[in-house]
């Protein structure tokens, strides 16, 4: 029998949580397709959802609008369900440049990507968990609506091994090669296998710290055991084991041969069409590229950019939706969309941008028309595939409200008794000097401040001005990547600086109890950055602090401001009434600052102990005395260290070394 969910928490549901849990569960059991949970900041929305999952015992996908929030949710769910399968499914690209063609300058840009192996392993682990068990929570980003290998083919390709099974060594090795595993008797890494006499060691693609040892005797599987690939220590013997493919995109040989025939037929038709339109260059280009891909598929079973032929490989018809993570989710699965007012529009926008780029590639002979079917889901396809759905947001959008028939499950009362921030409106004329004095007041008592501006220029100028006046301040902008952004937020919580200035980056889901003041400059400039939802979300960043306050700098009260202030006051009054009725004194949150990049308690496992305290590079090393040859050697040495740190998820050290290498390269140019 499949394991059931077991929720671990020191707390019992309280405040609005018990009623919200009851209504959500009732709705799901009554077959409601859409429900909306309006949960304010700090009301324990994740805990409510965790209780619903545990009570109903249904496999669940939680979708977040970005990797940062997905990582935060993954960490929380890991703590709630340490005995169950909590998985993480986001895009595995650290860097991704899709292939594109710019007709105006006749520039073709090749696809270029850097895959994060660790996230790839977590994606494989997520699909494996969905196929094998029911006690699964997959925390995903919008990456879940992009094409993935067909689950039916994926299941067909698996290698099942059982103790006592009759199979010769050659057959096992051939099957492993079909699963795209690579033989490597020297470096034993994820997705490889090695052979020593009658013993085959396999490092499963979805595993992080366990490998399989297959011991054969006279063409029979004598013993199957799991061991630690790092130390070689035997962990336990198992009666059976399933080896999953190295990638989601593996395809049986017969399907590849069928696909090749269909691709040849489409190529012939497309060539005729291009020649009839007198597009000779495009016809030649398409024939050359496609025939090269066909040759690669025939010899190796795959080719670069094989995803462009996914329609044929998955056996789907023209225009049919591609297989995605939703195809792996059981029929009675549950979908939770976090920060739905952001996530839903994102899902709706993915298809069109992808389509526009691919149409250009098809028109100019870089791809066959069938490449258009390698795409994310259209919004209506997503709606058709989505199981019973709970939308979670402090500010639900019109779509969610419409889908749930205008009925909203309120979770406004916080168990901690914390009130929504007090709101003050102050004049714009003195906003900068007034802000400076407010920051100094907060810094003196060890509290933090968030400041949101309307433009990048304003944010830069304000940061510079505050720095000149002795404020420890940082500026958060869109050019900062996910990892660095999480480091900045962690440093703010740790007190490395007192104020953080940003534009549209200080809204949904950021969990910072140390922030006691949110300052919104130019709050009376109507627009999406100063809409009712944006203002409520931004004000909510101070709702986790006992002394939470929001200052809106404005010369007039706009309709959006009036609605945001009214809604915040409504929530504040409801919380005060609850506190009074139950004798609750508001308590400060003491949430420990964890390194969110380690994604909960697993499955990340750092290979180096105590590396955190090491210095990645000298603060200001002097390279001027080195020769060009010595600089070259130093670059190679630092690059090796950088990749090692990145592999161990020690991003601060890797980033410091990257900057060091950049300085050295400049020096190398000058020296040579």
Swiss-Prot record:
Binding residue positions for ATP: 39-46
Tell me the domain of life.
Bacteria
Instruction: Give one GO molecular function term.
Output: DNA binding
**Segments carrying motif Beta-hairpin:** 92-115
Domain UVR: residue ranges = 632-667
Which stretches of sequence are listed as region Disordered?
A: 601-623
Question: Which Pfam families does the annotation name?
Answer: Helicase_C, ResIII, UVR, UvrB, UvrB_inter
One GO biological process this protein is involved in is: SOS response
Instruction: Tell me the keywords, alphabetical order.
Output: ATP-binding, Cytoplasm, DNA damage, DNA excision, DNA repair, Excision nuclease, Helicase, Hydrolase, Nucleotide-binding, SOS response
Q: Which residues form the Helicase C-terminal domain?
A: 431-597
| Any one cellular-component term (Gene Ontology) | excinuclease repair complex
Task: From the Swiss-Prot or TrEMBL record, state where the protein is found.
Answer: Cytoplasm
Read off the InterPro entries from this record: Helicase/UvrB_N, Helicase_ATP-bd, Helicase_C-like, P-loop_NTPase, UVR_dom, UVR_dom_sf, UvrB, UvrB_inter
Every copy of the Helicase ATP-binding domain together lies at: 26-183
| Family membership | Belongs to the UvrB family.
Show the domain comment. The beta-hairpin motif is involved in DNA binding.
How the protein assembles, per its UniProt entry?
A: Forms a heterotetramer with UvrA during the search for lesions. Interacts with UvrC in an incision complex.
Q: What does this protein do?
A: The UvrABC repair system catalyzes the recognition and processing of DNA lesions. A damage recognition complex composed of 2 UvrA and 2 UvrB subunits scans DNA for abnormalities. Upon binding of the UvrA(2)B(2) complex to a putative damaged site, the DNA wraps around one UvrB monomer. DNA wrap is dependent on ATP binding by UvrB and probably causes local melting of the DNA helix, facilitating insertion of UvrB beta-hairpin between the DNA strands. Then UvrB probes one DNA strand for the presence of a lesion.
Q: Which HAMAP family match?
A: UvrB
Task: Indicate what this protein is called per its UniProt record.
Answer: UvrABC system protein B
Naturally occurring in which organism (per UniProt): Edwardsiella ictaluri (strain 93-146)
Gene name per UniProt: uvrB
């Amino acid at each position: 029998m499949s394991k059931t969910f077991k929720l671990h928490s020191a707390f019992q549901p309280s405040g609005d949580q018990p009623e919200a849990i009851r209504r959500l569960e009732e709705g799901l059991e009554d077959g409601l397709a859409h429900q909306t949970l309006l949960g304010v900041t700090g009301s324990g929305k994740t805990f409510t959802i965790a209780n619903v999952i545990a009570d109903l015992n249904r496999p669940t996908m939680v979708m977040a609008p970005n990797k940062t929030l997905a990582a935060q949710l993954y960490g929380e769910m890991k703590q709630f369900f340490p005995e169950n399968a909590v998985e993480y499914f986001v895009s595995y690209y650290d860097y991704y440049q899709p292939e594109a063609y710019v007709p105006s300058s006749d520039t073709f840009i090749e696809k270029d990507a850097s895959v994060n192996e660790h996230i790839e392993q977590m994606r494989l682990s997520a699909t494996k968990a969905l196929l094998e068990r029911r006690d699964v929570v997959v925390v995903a980003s919008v990456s879940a609506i992009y094409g993935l290998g067909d689950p039916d083919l994926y299941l067909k390709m698996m290698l099942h091994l059982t103790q006592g099974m009759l199979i010769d060594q050659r057959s096992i090795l051939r099957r492993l090669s079909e699963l795209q595993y690579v033989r490597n008797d020297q470096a034993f890494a994820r997705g490889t296998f090695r052979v020593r006499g009658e013993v085959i060691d396999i490092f499963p693609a979805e595993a992080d710290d366990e490998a399989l040892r297959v011991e054969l005797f006279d063409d029979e599987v004598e013993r199957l055991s799991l061991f630690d690939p790092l130390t070689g220590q035997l962990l336990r013997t198992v009666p059976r084991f399933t080896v999953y493919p190295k990638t989601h995109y593996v395809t049986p040989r017969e399907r590849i041969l069928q696909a090749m025939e269909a691709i040849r037929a489409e190529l012939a038709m497309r060539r005729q069409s291009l020649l009839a339109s007198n597009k000779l260059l495009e016809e030649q280009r398409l024939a050359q590229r496609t025939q090269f891909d066909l040759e690669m598929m025939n010899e190796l079973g795959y080719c670069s950019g094989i995803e462009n032929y996914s329609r044929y490989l998955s056996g789907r018809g023209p225009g049919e939706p591609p297989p995605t993570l939703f195809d792996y989710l059981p029929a009675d699965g549950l979908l939770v969309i976090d920060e739905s007012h952001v996530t839903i529009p994102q899902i709706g926008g993915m298809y069109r941008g992808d389509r526009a780029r691919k149409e250009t590639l098809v028109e100019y002979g870089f791809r066959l028309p069938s490449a258009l079917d390698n795409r994310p889901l259209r919004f209506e396809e997503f709606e058709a595939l989505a199981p019973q759905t709970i939308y979670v947001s402090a500010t639900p959008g019109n779509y969610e409200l419409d889908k749930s028939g205008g009925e909203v499950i309120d979770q406004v009362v916080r168990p901690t008794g914390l009130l929504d921030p007090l709101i003050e409106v102050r004049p714009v004329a003195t906003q900068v000097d007034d802000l400076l004095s407010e920051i100094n007041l907060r810094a003196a008592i060890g509290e933090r401040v968030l400041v949101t501006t309307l433009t990048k220029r304003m944010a830069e100028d304000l940061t510079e001005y505050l720095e000149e006046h002795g404020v420890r301040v940082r500026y958060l902008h869109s050019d900062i990547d996910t990892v660095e952004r999480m480091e900045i937020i962690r440093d703010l919580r740790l007190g490395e600086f007192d104020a953080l200035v940003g534009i549209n980056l200080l809204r949904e889901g950021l969990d910072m109890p140390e922030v006691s003041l949110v300052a919104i400059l130019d709050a009376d400039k109507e627009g999406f950055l100063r809409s009712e939802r944006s203002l409520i979300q931004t004000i909510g960043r101070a709702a986790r602090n006992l002394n939470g306050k929001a200052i809106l700098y404005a010369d007039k009260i706009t309709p959006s401001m009036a609605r945001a202030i009214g809604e915040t006051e409504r929530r504040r009054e409801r919380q005060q009434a609850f506190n009074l009725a139950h004798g609750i004194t508001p308590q400060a949150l003491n949430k420990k600052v964890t390194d969110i990049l380690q994604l909960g308690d697993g499955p990340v496992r750092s290979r180096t102990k105590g590396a955190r305290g090491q210095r990645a590079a000298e603060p200001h090393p002097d390279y001027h005395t080195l020769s060009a040859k010595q600089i070259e050697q130093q670059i190679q040495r630092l690059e090796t260290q950088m990749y090692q740190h990145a592999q161990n998820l020690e991003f601060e050290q890797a980033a410091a070394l990257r900057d060091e290498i950049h300085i050295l390269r400049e020096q190398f140019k000058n020296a040579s």
